[in-house]
């Protein structure tokens, strides 16, 4: 039986990504790893890591097994040689080209999934290219409505908004957008994670989930009407919950995933608990995409000391999703539907 084919993009050439790919290749992970990257960049990364990795041109043929210390490469040429720790905007189009190549390969079935290493958003924007992140790039490529989810072995968190200034968040969360987000999360928990009837905790926007309108009306005007409508259609939705108590360990048994309203509302909890094992994945795409949950670590680039744990976790999750993709979504159990879940008290914080 042939191994799943995973496209791996190396991200920012001056960052830690190329070295992480080399360290990944040194493991015995059971996948056909195809690095979409400049070949010489990988050779220099291997030298910095002090590792001997055999780089093989990707011929597109299926592999039944992969030896540790081997990595297939789909070469893409850098515009200019990297200087570790110093991103160069001249390489921005190279970086975006690797993402396009991966997306096209996944869409055609050439790859089973794409796993992305971190890139430097500021460098791409400095090149005059408007760029918000991987999630938005793949959404635009696929013309798809997507949701960013970060998942650890203990917790799954999806975001109603992603890379927005905090002041822009309330206006960005509308009944239409929140309904769309919850539909995507519900459907993908069933399809990708095999959860027959997902239980989704939805956080409020304001402290204490608005305190009955005394700390903001977004919950009353937007969140509660959406939750009520979707509960009537059979979804199990808890909330809106105050974010300060929603992550208390004893409460987690009541839900399968959390929908947070903005980037820094929930991710600090997740990253503080499971930084090395948290994976970023994009829900709603027609293909599987996972990623590390850390940045380019420019201070470590070139030292050979980068930890590949998050990249390995992203690869393992991609493999799990590929394996599960061949199974039909589970049928929801009968007799379940409207459930507002537990009442989680706020704090005086």
Please tell me what each predicted stretch does.
Residues 1-133, 176-261, 265-288, 294-330, ...:
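Contiguous, glycine/small-aliphatic-enriched amphipathic segments in soluble metabolic enzymes
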Residues 59, 135-142:
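A glycine-rich helix N-cap at a beta->alpha junction
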Residues 137, 148, 157-159, 287-289:
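Conserved hydrophobic/aromatic beta-strand scaffold that supports enzyme active sites
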Residues 139-152:
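FAD-binding core/adjacent interface of flavoenzyme oxidoreductases
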Residues 150-180:
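Ligand-binding beta-strand-loop-alpha-helix segment within the catalytic cores
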């Amino acid at each position: 039986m042939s191994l799943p084919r995973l496209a791996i993009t190396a991200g920012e050439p001056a960052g830690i990504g190329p070295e992480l790919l080399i360290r990944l290749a040194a493991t015995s992970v059971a996948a056909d790893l195809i690095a979409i990257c400049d070949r010489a960049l990988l050779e220099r990364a291997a030298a910095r890591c002090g590792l001997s990795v055999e780089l093989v041109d990707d011929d597109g043929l299926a592999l039944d097994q992969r030896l540790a210390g081997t990595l297939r490469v789909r070469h893409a040429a850098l515009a200019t040689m990297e200087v570790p720790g110093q991103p160069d905007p001249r390489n921005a189009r190279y970086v975006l080209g690797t993402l396009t190549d991966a997306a096209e390969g996944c869409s055609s079935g050439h790859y089973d999934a794409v796993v992305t290493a971190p890139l430097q958003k500021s460098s791409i924007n400095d090149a005059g290219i408007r760029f918000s992140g991987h999630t938005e790039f793949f959404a635009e490529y696929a013309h798809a409505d997507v949701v960013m989810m970060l998942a650890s072995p203990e917790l799954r968190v999806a975001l109603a908004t992603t890379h927005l200034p905090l002041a822009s968040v309330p206006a960005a969360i509308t009944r239409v957008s929140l309904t769309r987000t919850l539909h995507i999360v519900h459907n993908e928990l069933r399809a990708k994670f095999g959860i027959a009837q997902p239980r989704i905790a939805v956080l409020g926007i304001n402290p204490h989930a608005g305190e009955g309108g005394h700390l903001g009306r977004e919950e009353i005007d937007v969140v509660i009407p959406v939750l009520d409508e979707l509960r009537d259609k059979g979804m199990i939705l808890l909330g809106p919950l105050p974010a300060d108590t929603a992550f208390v360990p004893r409460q987690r048994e009541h839900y399968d995933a959390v929908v947070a309203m903005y980037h820094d509302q929930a991710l600090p909890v997740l990253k503080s608990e499971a930084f090395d094992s948290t994976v970023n994945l994009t829900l709603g795409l027609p293909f599987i995409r996972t990623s590390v949950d850390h940045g380019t670590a420019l201070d470590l680039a070139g030292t050979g000391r980068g930890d590949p744990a998050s990249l390995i976790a992203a690869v393992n999750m991609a493999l799990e999703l590929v394996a599960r993709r061949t199974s039909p979504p589970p049928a929801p159990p009968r007799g379940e539907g409207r459930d507002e879940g537990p009442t989680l008290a706020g704090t005086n914080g």
